UniProtKB/Swiss-Prot annotation:
Gene Ontology BP terms: rRNA base methylation
Superkingdom per UniProt: Archaea
The protein's role, per its UniProt record: Methyltransferase involved in ribosomal biogenesis. Specifically catalyzes the N1-methylation of the pseudouridine corresponding to position 914 in M.jannaschii 16S rRNA.
This enzyme's EC code(s): 2.1.1.-
GO-annotated molecular function: rRNA (pseudouridine) methyltransferase activity; rRNA binding
Reaction catalysed by this enzyme: a pseudouridine in rRNA + S-adenosyl-L-methionine = an N(1)-methylpseudouridine in rRNA + S-adenosyl-L-homocysteine + H(+)
Residues reported to bind S-adenosyl-L-methionine: G176, G181, M198, G199, G200, A201, P202, L203
Protein's name in the database: Ribosomal RNA small subunit methyltransferase Nep1
Gene: nep1
Site (Stabilizes Arg-59): D61
């Protein structure tokens, strides 16, 4: 079973913002170069004012909570759930088995900033906790198949139905991982089907993910 967090609001601070006072302040605080910082709206709100699509950027906290939620599930701990996430530049990363995502948000930010630069953590040889899987969503689809998309404009259904579809087809379940706005058209085109739950109400990423994982557990896991 596979879940992929799509279009995550995760990226390093763009070069155009390196000289902004808020970015420089953050860099001095953490003792690193501006280009090694993760873009974060809570720290760089004013700096982000002129960024294109700023409403979909600078929210790594959403991915943090989503990963904490999914990696804390029996399904993941039994080795039955594979987790992927797509960052802002389009790359997709795979979370290894048995990974303990840092509960401390600042530690998580540092880990993801390193990941975006080295494409695996820890860097070097040995087993990676998180590693690059695909350089684009198109490549991901080639390797893993088209995905079942959770989308508030999709066909209304239940999480049980979505979980059953994923189990019968072997396709990943895609969940948006950004604060507001729409999926890119290129993302929508790569979905095999799209469904909404809870009457199409807008739900938080981790809310959707937790409901889907629980539905998968009820259908698949012997311990639920």
């Amino acid at each position: 079973m596979k879940i992929v967090f799509l279009e995550c609001s995760v990226e390093l601070v763009p070069r155009s913002l390196w000289s902004h006072p808020q970015v420089l302040k953050s860099a001095r605080r953490y003792g690193i170069e501006p280009g090694d910082l993760l873009l974060d709206k809570s720290l760089h709100y004013n700096a982000m004012a002129e960024l294109p699509a700023k409403w979909k950027r600078g929210r790594p906290d959403i991915l943090h909570v989503a990963l904490l939620t999914t990696t804390d599930s029996p399904l993941y701990n039994e080795g039955l759930l594979r987790i992927y996430f797509q960052v802002y530049d389009g790359r997709l990363f795979e979370v290894g088995t048995g990974v303990r995502v840092p509960k401390n948000y600042e530690r998580f930010r540092g880990l993801v900033a390193q990941l975006l630069k080295t494409e695996r953590v820890p860097p070097g040889e040995g087993e990676a906790l998180i590693r690059l899987h695909s350089r684009s969503l198109a490549e991901f689809v080639e390797r893993e198949g088209r995905f079942i998309l959770m989308w508030e404009k999709g066909s209304p259904t239940t999480t049980t139905y979505v979980a059953a579809r994923a189990l019968s087809t072997g396709l990943p379940i895609g969940v948006g991982c950004f604060p507001r706005g729409e999926f890119k058209r290129s993302t929508l085109r790569k979905a095999s089907e799209a469904y909404s739950i809870m009457g199409g109400a807008p739900l938080k990423t981790w809310g959707v993910a937790s409901r889907i994982v629980y539905a998968l557990e009820r259908l698949k896991s012997p311990f639920t």
